[in-house]
Amino acid sequence: MSYKFPNNLKYADTHEYVKEENGLLKIGVSEFAIDQLGDIVFVELVEKGTNLQKGETFGTIESVKAVEEVYLPFAGEVLSVNESVIDNPEILQNDPIGNGWLLIIKPESNVLLDELMNSDEYKSKVSPN
């Protein structure tokens, strides 16, 4: 499978992506990680208004192969939860970078997106040598 690695995203070691939009952060899971999971059957996410610390679990993704936790790369308050991926996990599977985003957070403080991998670094990490 050929994966997309948009230049406007940053990636955590745990395969979450971050997209900055007007000072807020949209969080999701990379195409690579979603593909590795296989058919997704269930998504559970924290509630809107939840305050989370960096590295804290904000949900789980269950597939026919495994149950994986997803982690927040930066501390912040959850402003929005993508209810459509909870109601229809296929959205996450089919369009993880577009309509399959998971959360929008207001970061606790100024975040250093450069702490995360850029698209080229992430592509190198997940691509076979």
From Swiss-Prot:
Location of the Lipoyl-binding domain: 24-106
Keywords: Lipoyl
GO cellular component, one term: cytosol
Modification type N6-lipoyllysine: residues: K65
Record-linked Pfam families: GCV_H
GO BP term (any one): glycine decarboxylation via glycine cleavage system
Cofactor annotation remark: Binds 1 lipoyl cofactor covalently.
UniProt xrefs under CDD domains: GCS_H (cd06848)
Cofactor(s) in the UniProt record: (R)-lipoate
Xref: SUPFAM superfamilies: Single hybrid motif
PANTHER family xref list: GLYCINE CLEAVAGE SYSTEM H PROTEIN (PTHR11715), GLYCINE CLEAVAGE SYSTEM H PROTEIN-RELATED (PTHR11715:SF3)
Biological role stated in the UniProt entry: The glycine cleavage system catalyzes the degradation of glycine. The H protein shuttles the methylamine group of glycine from the P protein to the T protein.
Quaternary structure and partners: The glycine cleavage system is composed of four proteins: P, T, L and H.
Similarity comment: Belongs to the GcvH family.
This protein's name: Glycine cleavage system H protein
